[in-house]
Amino acid sequence: MALKNINYLLIFYLSFSLLIYIKNSFCNKNNTRCLSNSCQNNSTCKDFSKDNDCSCSDTANNLDKDCDNMKDPCFSNPCQGSATCVNTPGERSFLCKCPPGYSGTICETTIGSCGKNSCQHGGICHQDPIYPVCICPAGYAGRFCEIDHDECASSPCQNGAVCQDGIDGYSCFCVPGYQGRHCDLEVDECASDPCKNEATCLNEIGRYTCICPHNYSGVNCELEIDECWSQPCLNGATCQDALGAYFCDCAPGFLGDHCELNTDECASQPCLHGGLCVDGENRYSCNCTGSGFTGTHCETLMPLCWSKPCHNNATCEDSVDNYTCHCWPGYTGAQCEIDLNECNSNPCQSNGECVELSSEKQYGRITGLPSSFSYHEASGYVCICQPGFTGIHCEEDVNECSSNPCQNGGTCENLPGNYTCHCPFDNLSRTFYGGRDCSDILLGCTHQQCLNNGTCIPHFQDGQHGFSCLCPSGYTGSLCEIATTLSFEGDGFLWVKSGSVTTKGSVCNIALRFQTVQPMALLLFRSNRDVFVKLELLSGYIHLSIQVNNQSKVLLFISHNTSDGEWHFVEVIFAEAVTLTLIDDSCKEKCIAKAPTPLESDQSICAFQNSFLGGLPVGMTSNGVALLNFYNMPSTPSFVGCLQDIKIDWNHITLENISSGSSLNVKAGCVRKDWCESQPCQSRGRCINLWLSYQCDCHRPYEGPNCLREYVAGRFGQDDSTGYVIFTLDESYGDTISLSMFVRTLQPSGLLLALENSTYQYIRVWLERGRLAMLTPNSPKLVVKFVLNDGNVHLISLKIKPYKIELYQSSQNLGFISASTWKIEKGDVIYIGGLPDKQETELNGGFFKGCIQDVRLNNQNLEFFPNPTNNASLNPVLVNVTQGCAGDNSCKSNPCHNGGVCHSRWDDFSCSCPALTSGKACEEVQWCGFSPCPHGAQCQPVLQGFECIANAVFNGQSGQILFRSNGNITRELTNITFGFRTRDANVIILHAEKEPEFLNISIQDSRLFFQLQSGNSFYMLSLTSLQSVNDGTWHEVTLSMTDPLSQTSRWQMEVDNETPFVTSTIATGSLNFLKDNTDIYVGDRAIDNIKGLQGCLSTIEIGGIYLSYFENVHGFINKPQEEQFLKISTNSVVTGCLQLNVCNSNPCLHGGNCEDIYSSYHCSCPLGWSGKHCELNIDECFSNPCIHGNCSDRVAAYHCTCEPGYTGVNCEVDIDNCQSHQCANGATCISHTNGYSCLCFGNFTGKFCRQSRLPSTVCGNEKTNLTCYNGGNCTEFQTELKCMCRPGFTGEWCEKDIDECASDPCVNGGLCQDLLNKFQCLCDVAFAGERCEVDLADDLISDIFTTIGSVTVALLLILLLAIVASVVTSNKRATQGTYSPSRQEKEGSRVEMWNLMPPPAMERLI
């Protein structure tokens, strides 16, 4: 049983071991390729084979074992036509060899001829009989020149430079430290000696390093090390830096290298007389206590002032045997013990309290004193002011209104130490305010009780609200219920009786308002037995007069017009002085006059018993008559107007308090009418309102109550008759008179006035050329500038004064003459308009024709036609003088010509002229209105006709113009006038000849030349201008006889009116020979000039007759004037010459050159501009010159704004951004479109290759050095520098990483990964091992039986060994290779791309 159990146990172990092995075998079988889905094109993968075995679904396609590629690419005959398919050995690709005439990858393109773009890169296509052939440029090859030959294939660039292939060439980009075409020249960076302060320079590749000596630092060893940086010096000493050292400058009192020792200043024992020396820092002090001495060194014997005898902080001064106290201000006494009392003079005003500054006990108690007591400031006092005052002496009143205490809009008035508020009336709320601060509402006017627009003023007194009425003018009473206005209607008065006031020093007054238009009127009269006072208007002014005992004592007046119908207030106050006051809106201030009181005795000036207002009761009572006769008073007109608010001795006067019978023509109220409102004077005079009526002050020549009548005018010279008026004076007028009259005339001459007697002519006044003239015997004649004969009415005045006679027009003084004094006597005669003696009249301007009205001698009217009711005192004698001022019928003679219509005017006529006629009588025809001249000509009116004026243009080829007189010229030809502008230096302008007479005007040697021989003269006259005239500008020329009235005369030349004129020295005749059929040539050429005049010539005038360039043109009006020069030649004349050189205005823009062609101009434009004025900017961008940029047009140029990466005028240059690159440490610069990048070399990285990858080692010296990379050890062996490389590196500088994969150590398709000094094989899924040499895919059945046999034998021998062997076998796969099937199956095969790094640059010390 036990054995059976053992057998069962053995069978169990064997079976279990077999199952484990089978499991592990299946898990390790080579089925990984099927898991990776390597079979393509819907094929099926077969497991358990060494390699893939794919069953392809389409066996006809000749696919490989993975069913993804064809074993033979030519299997499907991909080449077209008769092309031959060639299989590339070792590759699954093919190449088609095309027959002639075909091309393309599969020979699909037929080549028939050189088609478009058949040859690339500029190759030239050559037509072959079979197919075209491309002749390639240098640097390219291939059938179509499509292959760029790589010139870099031979690696021409040295020292790690980067070769850039070009077209038929190459470029080497050197790493820093090398230069030359092939980068074969090393750069010595130490050549410029960059290291300072004797430092050692190490030359490296592309850079240098400075080995600094002791005490220097910095990149170039330029910085000295500051040894004072650590602050080694003590006790305030100053550290001085030196080269490799420092020095300490000790402060006074210290010693030592670091100033650490303090000097003992007491060592010299400076203190005397037993004084104790106390040492300090750089000083000492002596303590003299108990020695009896004082001073810095205890050297001075203690003075008498030591006992402090002086009081009040006074200064004590010792002398030989005494002392003196120097007191502070405010103190006195031998020891300054007396305090002066500055308040004794009571300096503080407004009850201010005076406090002395020396009162120390008051400090801190009174706020006006300083904060603390000081003897230095104890002199003086301060004033403690009462509330409301300030200032040093309380002299300033504080403005209590500054705090705005008044409320509700009240106005604050500042008072001494106080204020008061003037409270307003609030119109919006209709509220009155009162109280000290206007804070109380006053209710007294709640129920308004004031009448007649009186103003209610509320108040609050004794707890009661009340009011008072402020009455307007004309009312009084507590409620303004009593009217005070009185109306005086003339010859009336108001008698007021009052008790006498006899107290000396009493004050009485008179006050009233009045309104009147009277200039003379009595306002008030007061009197007693010996004194009377009169207030009256004299010439509109207020007058106050006082008489005492029939003698005038006081006479006051105010020179301000009060007779203007407005209200005026006047007041008289009798006190110690008499004051007259006028209050008027037109007075800027009160009008006041004062005088001393007229009484000398104890009697009061107020002792008046009777007062009369508005007038006196003349003849009314015996008392009144006696009163007037007693004082012999001149009568003053009674007042007419209104009085109101009359107060006598402060009492209101109204009709109610006047007794019956004490007034006459006085009514209550004020009745006034504006009499002038209806304009009763008819605008012929000034209306004067007389209160009860009106009066017209008539303007001359009107008269009558309403100025309706007019003084009759006298008509002189009616229908050209001769007449005059005689006035014989019937009284004497003395030596001062005024004679005036109205005058109207259109004649320039005529006698106006003559004053004389039978033997003597006093004065004459007449018209001379329309102006007034005046003459007296033995005086010069006066002729004024004023023109009188304009047909208007003028007021002429003559004022005769002693030694002087003045002439006026209205109020304007026209002038005066000095004359002897004479008197106008009775029997003298005034003549107006003429004199009886016709011959004498003609000598004084002739008979006057016109009207004279309102003649006045002083204020007496001398009427031509007096009214019988006027009782005229002077009866005139009239000769051919009619009434009124009717004018003559001037149209009676039909004065208008050419169909004009006559209109009669006063002593004149006017004509309504037909079209194109003018003149007073339409006698002038406006020929130019008919447009008689051709285009380009200007019509110029001349006497009895017109001329066509134009500036002619001569171009040098147009030929001369011939003129000839028409035979009707009768005037004297004494001058020639013309204008021209030319640049010719020699040319003839005008030429005429009729032997022996000759005329020539030309330009010779740039100057104007004039020749003339005429009349009976045997000499030829020549004149040459002083200035050149061929400057192209206009010149105006006048050639004239200096004496045109003589048969022969010198001639003068005027050019542009510039003085001096050129005058001939000989005389010759006029130009009259041109009137006799003489040919006149204009614009001829000079003898030595093949061309004629080239320029402009204006129309020439000879004696005022034009040489017109236009003959009588068909269709135009022929010139009607008799005197003409005719154009004989038929050649047309070009007109339109410009008056000025148009080029002066600079019409050519942008620097264009202007050429004056006389009738216009021509602009020669600079580069970049075109157009008539060179105003058009030529667009240089039109041709698109910018290849890689945007074009901006400029003047005669363009500017290209290049795209990034391009430059050049036309953006044609590709920018080499590496020219100024910053690539360091031998890096290669790679240029891009917008910049560059650095290809780092060796052990460097970063944007500019300035950071090291691994530390480097430098050995050698300043001349020869070597840098080892990648941790190499630099050693010097037998004077040769070598790098001992770490395992895995090689090269001269250890710059090369040894490629351990170069020998292909990995088998069975394993991928070799190069590592540092080793390699790693990435095995295929079916292999393992360090080199993938272990095959994991043996036959599964063979493995099973071999394993079972081995296990059986082992179990039979040692059961335990079999179990161990089974466990070891099961774990075998887990320790072999580097492959993880699960990861590879999930993520696919791992591929690592290793950067191939160029060798680093060699660095060495030079």
UniProtKB/Swiss-Prot annotation:
Changing residue 1031 to N: Found in patients with rod-cone retinal dystrophy; likely pathogenic. Keywords: Calcium, Cell membrane, Cell projection, Disease variant, Disulfide bond, EGF-like domain, Glycoprotein, Leber congenital amaurosis, Membrane, Repeat, Retinitis pigmentosa, Secreted, Signal, Transmembrane, Transmembrane helix. Preferential expression in retina, also expressed in brain, testis, fetal brain and fetal eye. Expressed at the outer limiting membrane and apical to adherens junctions in the retina. Gene3D superfamilies: 2.60.120.200, Laminin. The chain crosses the membrane at residues 1348-1368. Residues 1-25 form the signal peptide. Changing residue 1198 to C: Found in patients with early-onset retinal dystrophy; likely pathogenic. Pfam families: EGF, hEGF, Laminin_G_2. InterPro entries: ConA-like_dom_sf, EGF-like_Ca-bd_dom, EGF-like_CS, EGF-like_dom, EGF-type_Asp/Asn_hydroxyl_site, EGF_Ca-bd_CS, Growth_fac_rcpt_cys_sf, Laminin_G. Changing residue 894 to S: Found in patients with retinitis pigmentosa; uncertain significance; heterozygous. GO terms for cellular component: adherens junction; apical junction complex; apical plasma membrane; extracellular region; glial cell projection; microvillus; photoreceptor inner segment; photoreceptor outer segment. Plays a role in photoreceptor morphogenesis in the retina. May maintain cell polarization and adhesion. This is Protein crumbs homolog 1.
